């Protein structure tokens, strides 16, 4: 499916970025931690070398290159582990499983920053406004929730905040094979975004509380 992924994640952003350049409109493009290979145990900066592990990461990296090549005022925002009250995501999956399970095995050696979709949207607007007014340089930035955590740790917080009594057993990635390889290290260094635009990392635990309230799943 890499050809389809490339159309969606590279060709479409290229067309949008070119249109924005022609109209002198700032363009904010959302990318992913999957452009990295997940090696090491430190946070990756926007300037670190990329090495995607699979088709998704390659298509997103191609999209980044296309947006930059359009030559306009742009910001590429790499983020990770996105969750919200809408669509399919880890939070909603955990809540669904908690309805029928009292214990779960969750990967504990993948580390990253869960990021509320609402905070990503607000950040995109702030960046676009800054670029429109001539403040803030174009380029690649990272934006992810804090503090960094494993999927297992994320699950425990979901169950704690929602009042679900579900035991979480840590397992390694190799015990939970997936069709697409996932990075072990999804930590993103977000200091350049805060320096350029004054936007700090969001506390994902606060974002989780808002999502659970929106879903009607918060602990009473």
Predicted regions and their residues:
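Mid/C-terminal beta-alpha module of Rossmann-like enzyme folds, strongest
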Residues: 123-124, 130-179
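Amphipathic terminal alpha-helices
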Residues: 204-220
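Active-site "gating" loop of Rossmann-like NAD(P)-dependent oxidoreductase/epimerase domains
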Residues: 33-53
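SDR active-site strand-loop-helix element
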Residues: 27-33, 37, 77-79
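NAD(P)-cofactor binding segment of oxidoreductase domains
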Residues: 1-28
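NAD(P)-dependent short-chain dehydrogenase/reductase
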Residues: 65-112, 118-119, 125-126
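Active-site helix of classical SDR
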Residues: 59
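Glycine-rich Rossmann NAD(P)(H)-binding loop
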Residues: 106-111, 139-148, 196
């Amino acid at each position: 499916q890499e050809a389809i992924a490339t159309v969606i994640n590279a060709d479409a952003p290229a067309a949008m970025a070119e249109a924005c350049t022609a109209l002198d409109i700032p363009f904010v493009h959302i990318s992913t931690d999957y452009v990295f290979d997940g090696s090491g145990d430190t946070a990756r900066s926007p300037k670190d070398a990329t090495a995607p592990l699979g088709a998704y990461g390659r298509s997103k990296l191609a999209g980044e290159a296309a947006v930059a090549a359009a030559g306009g005022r742009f910001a590429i925002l790499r983020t990770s582990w996105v969750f919200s009250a809408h669509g399919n995501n880890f939070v909603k999956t955990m809540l669904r499983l908690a309805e029928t399970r009292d214990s779960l095995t969750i990967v504990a050696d993948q580390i990253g920053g869960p990021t509320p979709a609402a905070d990503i949207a607000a950040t995109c607007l702030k960046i676009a406004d800054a670029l429109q007014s001539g403040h803030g340089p174009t380029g690649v930035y990272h934006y992810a929730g804090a503090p960094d955590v494993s999927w297992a740790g994320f699950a425990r917080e979901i169950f704690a905040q929602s009042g679900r009594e579900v035991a979480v057993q840590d397992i390694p990635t190799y015990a939970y094979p997936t069709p697409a390889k996932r990075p072990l290290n999804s930590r993103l260094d977000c200091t350049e975004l805060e320096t350029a635009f004054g936007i700090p990392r969001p506390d994902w635990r606060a974002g989780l509380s808002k999502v659970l309230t929106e879903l009607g799943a918060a602990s009473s």
